[in-house]
Every structure is written in C-alpha cells, then in structure tokens.
C-alpha cells in the first residue's frame, strides 16, 4: 500500500466536511464517537468512500480490559477495515497494543512493509505508560517493518522510521487559540 499525503479529519467531523479531496479519516477519538460505525457500517460507506484514505478504527485496548474484550476490539478493527477495502476505500491500518502480553495477537493480520498509523495520545503521561508504548512501537517496527508511520500525537524521540506526524486535536485547538491572541 502506498502512502497518500492528506489532511486527516476525525470521524466525528467527517460528515460536516464539504470538500473531501485530499483528506482522510482517522479514529483517534473516544470509542463512543465511532462505535455507531460498527452497528451500521453500510450507512457510512458512501460518506467514507468520498475521502482519499480511511484509517481503521482505533478501538480501545486498555490494559485493564479483559483479554477477550481486547481481542474483540482488535477483530472489529480488522473487520471494518476489510469491509471498507471491499467497498473500494483506501484503508490505512491503525496499530495498537495494550501490554507485552497483547504482542501475541495485536500484530496478527497487519500488513508488512506498508503504511501504518499509531497514536501516542494518553501514553506519554507516566513513565510506565511511556515505556509500554515504546516497547510496543519497537515490536511493531520489528514485526511489520512499515514504510511509513502516520503518527498521531507527540512523537517520542526514541521512535524511528519514516514518520508522518499528525497534530492531535488539542494541539491544533491550542494553536488556533494562540493565533487569535
């Protein structure tokens, strides 16, 4: 899969964007913002297919979630991605993990030597979370060997690869706020 440069818009704003050329959809949001996609995907396919790229949903894999729920969320991400591809959409896989134990399955079904997306939001606010994120990132790089990593949020200096950074909504909001001063 080739990398397509685009401006990324959260799924929660997808229906309000008028000119969708050069834009893609991400799901780096609270799960409640996009769970409706799982229950009624055919309703959203026409809108989503009008975008240049769509990342797979970033269903939560919190470390305190039961393993069955984590695997179920991983499955839902893959099912939605495969369905959107069948509908002709250009899909970018979102890669996520919870802890070292999740490495046994969280990279299953992901493409190698292609474009992937990750988010560091919520992972850099404690030493333990930061270390777990970096351990998963290194594991992802070793196993998947991505050509590009679309990175949402703060990029830790230890992260390597061809990183394409997307500013998190809070950063864009802060920049807009500061520019009005």
What annotation goes with each model-predicted range?
Residues 1-27:
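Basic, amphipathic N-terminal segments that precede the first structured/catalytic domain
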Residues 17-20, 30, 37-180:
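Eukaryote-skewed repeat-based solenoidal scaffolds used as protein-protein interaction platforms
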């Amino acid at each position: 899969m080739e990398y397509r440069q685009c401006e990324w818009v959260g799924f929660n704003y997808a229906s309000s964007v008028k000119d969708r050329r050069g834009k893609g959809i991400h799901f780096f949001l609270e799960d409640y913002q996009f769970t409706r996609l799982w229950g009624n995907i055919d309703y959203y396919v026409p809108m989503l297919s009008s975008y240049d790229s769509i990342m797979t949903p970033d269903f939560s894999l919190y470390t305190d979630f039961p393993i069955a729920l984590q695997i179920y969320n991983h499955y839902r991400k893959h099912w939605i991605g495969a369905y959107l591809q069948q509908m002709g959409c250009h899909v970018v896989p979102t890669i996520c993990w919870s802890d070292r134990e999740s490495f046994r399955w969280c990279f299953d079904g992901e493409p190698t030597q292609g474009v992937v997306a990750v988010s560091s939001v919520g992972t850099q606010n404690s030493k333990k979370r930061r270390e777990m994120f970096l351990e998963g990132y290194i594991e992802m790089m070793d196993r998947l060997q991505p050509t590009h990593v679309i990175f949402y949020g703060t990029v830790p200096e230890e992260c390597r690869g061809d990183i394409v950074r997307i500013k998190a909504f809070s950063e864009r909001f802060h920049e807009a706020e500061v520019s009005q001063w």
